[in-house]
């Protein structure tokens, strides 16, 4: 909304003007994705000298390379990154941290280091035939699409997975002219994907085959090499509830083949941060960094971690929220003062829930019609009109106000 109204310059100038005085503290952030960018934003406003390192050629991480333009226009992202640069943050690209020596130099040169790398190491299917031409990791496919390279996919695409990456890959393949099916081994209600994104995919004509698990990529010879000819799948049934709180998928004897010429794999990603353990930073068995749940300090006294590096694959919003918490604690850790609230205006607020409450459903944003959007990557959500925004604001029962003494309130919530 800020960009559509052309208000960003005045807001940028205000944020730059209200930066706290320089502290003389130097901080390094590894990873220029949602967590790294958010941490850099807050810490630079607090007066610290911040340098962000990233293995890619541009900042943004999953926002730049993974989330399609129809969800997040790249010009908006570029403006956000430009603001962070104007706040004084320095970016160093094409720099991967892969050895103890690199990490040691970073720790020695800074007052603290934040590890904010994303979960980019993709999980394979572990089935026969997945090495043939035409089987693509979702991250690789989405990155190519984000660079307008038009990834090589056939006319019949099967996407394996039930998360947001799977939905993004399916809707992107559709926009590239393919007929798309999603295969997921659990029930639709168990899909971790955002409900609105899944609904959008179904509206656009993408079919979802649930309780279905891949067992083999069927190949054919073409031009002297093996390519995808189909995906052999197995029907599943619901078993006992597992540790995730969902029924365990149990294989049945029903196995059949889905004809296709491309398979996009989106079944999960892992964090890979080589060299840190040799520096004394402890990790979980799956590669995530062990960090205190409140301070986000690791087992090394100068190394913090946040985002995917700690949580594993998470939403951009979760990573950015965690980065704000890290920035607040880190600032106090290196300055010895509680200064974070100086970034916000103080005001009086009567912390009371209105005595008269009326039910009001959530206002839905305006979306471009299906036929006008499914063949291109233009932004599909037009957001709220001014009147819709006012109505939605009126639904609030109280503001999320920070207090020195935290108080707990409860109030009925509407969908």
For each feature predicted by the language model, list its residue ranges.
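Ferredoxin-type iron-sulfur electron-transfer modules in oxidoreductases and energy-metabolism complexes
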Residues: 1-19, 145, 373-391, 408, ...
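Glycine-rich dinucleotide-binding loop and its adjacent helix/turn
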Residues: 3-21, 79-99, 122-176, 284-294, ...
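Feature captures the FAD/FMN-dependent oxidoreductase FAD-binding
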Residues: 21, 26-30, 78-127, 216-232, ...
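Beta1-alpha1 glycine-rich phosphate/pyrophosphate-binding loop at the start
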Residues: 25-97, 123, 140, 168-218, ...
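Glycine-rich Rossmann-fold phosphate-binding loop(s) that bind the pyrophosphate
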Residues: 30-35, 161-163, 308
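FAD-site-proximal beta/loop scaffold in flavoenzymes
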Residues: 131-155, 241-313, 321, 352-354
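A conserved FAD-binding loop/helix module that cradles the flavin
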Residues: 169, 306-340
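Mid-to-C-terminal Rossmann-like scaffold of FAD/NAD(P)H-dependent oxidoreductases
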Residues: 203-205, 213-229, 237-239, 325, ...
